[in-house]
């Protein structure tokens, strides 16, 4: 399950309700949707194809619809990062750079795990997420993404525009999800 680790003092929060309560103060959404409804072969398949993607999105159709209606999102896709991903280290170098977005960064973890370090007040809080968990990092929040020791994650991403996201590293440097 999720875990918050505060870099300044090493404090750890592991209780899901405490995590949800703490993060909500800063506009970060945390929720648990679970993965029990997905067959293991679909969940664990990192060779993503259209059939696999459709099965995953259909399994979470209700939650995705509610999220879209509540937050104004319009589209979703599946993203996979693993040792099979071409140029994984290059992608991770980009994701590990501190940035923000003009839209929320929405991820539901289907399988695997990862870490979203987020700047909160004068600290950096590592938000560890695992399969079955939803994280929404709000627009404007300074953050980055890291794979953990498992080096794999499979997520549903949700967007407000068909173009997806644009990372803003500083005033003069951006990257889009297509870079």
UniProtKB/Swiss-Prot annotation:
- Residues folding into a coiled coil are none
Which UniProt key words apply to this protein?
Answer: Amino-acid biosynthesis, Dioxygenase, Iron, Metal-binding, Methionine biosynthesis, Nickel, Oxidoreductase
Which co-factors does it depend on? Fe(2+); Ni(2+)
Q: Name one GO biological process term.
A: L-methionine salvage from S-adenosylmethionine
Q: Which InterPro entries does the UniProt record give?
A: ARD, ARD_bac, RmlC-like_jellyroll, RmlC_Cupin_sf
This protein's record includes keyword Coiled coil: no
Q: Mind telling me which Pfam families this protein's record contains?
A: ARD
* Residues annotated for Fe(2+) binding in this entry: 99, 101, 105, 143
Q: List the disulfide bonds.
A: none
How the cofactor is bound: the record states: Binds 1 Fe(2+) cation per monomer.
The reaction(s) catalysed by this protein are: 1,2-dihydroxy-5-(methylsulfanyl)pent-1-en-3-one + O2 = 3-(methylsulfanyl)propanoate + CO + formate + 2 H(+); 1,2-dihydroxy-5-(methylsulfanyl)pent-1-en-3-one + O2 = 4-methylsulfanyl-2-oxobutanoate + formate + 2 H(+)
Task: Please tell me which top-level EC class this enzyme sits in.
Answer: oxidoreductase
Q: Where is this site: May play a role in transmitting local conformational changes?
A: 104
Q: Where does Ni(2+) bind?
A: 99, 101, 105, 143
**Where exactly is the site Important to generate the dianion?**
107
Q: A Gene Ontology MF term for this entry?
A: nickel cation binding
What are the EC numbers? 1.13.11.54, 1.13.11.53
Give the site residues for May play a role in metal incorporation in vivo: 98
**Which pathway does the protein contribute to?**
Amino-acid biosynthesis; L-methionine biosynthesis via salvage pathway; L-methionine from S-methyl-5-thio-alpha-D-ribose 1-phosphate: step 5/6
Q: How does it assemble?
A: Monomer.
- HAMAP family found in the cross-reference section: Salvage_MtnD
| Protein function | Catalyzes 2 different reactions between oxygen and the acireductone 1,2-dihydroxy-3-keto-5-methylthiopentene (DHK-MTPene) depending upon the metal bound in the active site. Fe-containing acireductone dioxygenase (Fe-ARD) produces formate and 2-keto-4-methylthiobutyrate (KMTB), the alpha-ketoacid precursor of methionine in the methionine recycle pathway. Ni-containing acireductone dioxygenase (Ni-ARD) produces methylthiopropionate, carbon monoxide and formate, and does not lie on the methionine recycle pathway.
Similarity field:
Belongs to the acireductone dioxygenase (ARD) family.
Q: What is this protein called?
A: Acireductone dioxygenase
């Amino acid at each position: 399950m999720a875990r918050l680790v505060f870099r300044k003092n090493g404090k750890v929060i592991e209780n899901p309700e405490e995590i949800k309560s703490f993060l909500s103060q800063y506009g970060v959404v945390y929720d648990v949707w679970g993965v029990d409804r997905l067959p293991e072969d679909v969940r664990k398949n990192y060779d993503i194809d259209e059939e696999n993607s459709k099965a995953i999105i259909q399994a979470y159709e209700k939650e995705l619809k509610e999220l879209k209606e509540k937050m104004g999102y319009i589209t979703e896709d599946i993203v996979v990062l693993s040792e099979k991903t071409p140029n994984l280290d290059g992608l991770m170098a980009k994701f590990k750079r501190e940035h923000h977005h003009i839209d929320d960064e929405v991820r539901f973890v289907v399988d695997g795990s990862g870490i979203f370090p987020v700047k909160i007040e004068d600290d950096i809080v590592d938000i560890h997420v695992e399969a079955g968990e939803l994280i929404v990092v709000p627009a404007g929040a300074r953050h980055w993404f890291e794979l953990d020791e498992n080096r794999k994650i499979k997520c549903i991403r949700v967007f407000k525009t068909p173009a997806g996201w644009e990372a803003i590293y500083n005033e003069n440097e951006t990257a889009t999800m297509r870079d």
